[in-house]
C-alpha cells in the first residue's frame, strides 16, 4: 500500500511529513511525500515558513503520480492559496480516500496557513476530504464558531461537513 503525505517539513520530526512517514512505517505502509513548505521549528520555538513554488509543487506531484499507484492521501499544511489551488487541480479527479488534517497553528504558536488562504482552504480542500480531523481550535477557526454547550462538537462537525467533507471528526 502506498500513502501520500502532502504537507510541511518539520526538522524536529514532531509534525509534518516526517511524522507521517514514521506513522506509515509503523503500519508497514510505503510512505510518499510532497512538501508544501519548509518550516524552521523545534519542540519549543517556531522560526519561519518558506512555502515551495507552484513549479516545484507540480514537479513533485508529477514525479510521484507517474511512478506510483496511490492508495490514499493525507493532507496537512498547505500554507497559501497558490498551494491550495495547485493541489486542488491535481486532486479533484482522483477517486481515492483523502484525509485532511487542517494545520493552522504550530504547538509553539507559529501560523502555518496564511489567514488569506483559509477561505480557499474551505472552498477547495475541505470538499476533497473523505474525512477531516480538525482539533478544537482548527474547527472553531474553520466555522468561526466557538465550541460550547450550545455549539457542541457534533454541531460544529456538521457545519464542517456542510462545507463538503464526507465525515468530520473533531478531536477535543
Name each model feature, range by range.
Residues 3-25:
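Glycine/serine-rich anion-binding loops at beta->alpha junctions
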Residues 12-19, 52-59, 68, 78-82, ...:
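Conserved active-site and cofactor/substrate-binding residues in soluble primary-metabolism enzymes
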Amino acid at each position: 500500500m502506498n500513502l501520500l503525505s502532502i504537507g510541511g517539513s518539520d526538522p524536529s520530526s514532531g509534525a509534518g511529513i516526517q511524522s507521517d512517514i514514521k506513522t506509515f512505517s509503523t503500519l508497514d505502509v510505503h510512505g510518499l511525500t510532497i512538501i508544501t513548505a519548509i518550516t524552521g521549528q523545534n519542540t519549543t520555538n517556531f522560526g519561519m515558513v518558506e512555502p515551495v513554488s507552484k513549479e516545484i509543487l507540480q514537479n513533485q506531484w508529477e514525479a510521484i503520480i507517474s511512478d506510483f499507484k496511490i492508495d490514499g492521501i493525507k493532507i496537512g499544511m498547505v500554507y497559501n492559496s497558490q498551494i491550495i489551488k495547485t493541489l486542488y487541480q491535481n486532486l479533484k479527479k482522483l477517486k481515492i480516500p483523502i484525509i485532511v488534517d487542517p494545520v493552522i497553528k504550530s504547538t509553539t504558536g507559529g501560523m502555518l496557513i496564511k489567514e488569506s488562504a483559509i477561505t480557499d482552504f474551505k472552498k477547495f480542500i475541505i470538499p476533497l476530504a473523505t474525512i477531516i480531523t480538525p482539533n478544537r481550535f482548527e474547527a472553531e477557526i474553520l466555522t468561526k464558531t466557538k465550541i460550547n454547550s450550545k455549539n457542541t462538537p457534533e454541531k460544529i462537525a456538521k457545519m464542517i461537513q456542510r462545507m463538503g467533507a464526507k465525515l468530520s471528526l473533531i478531536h477535543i
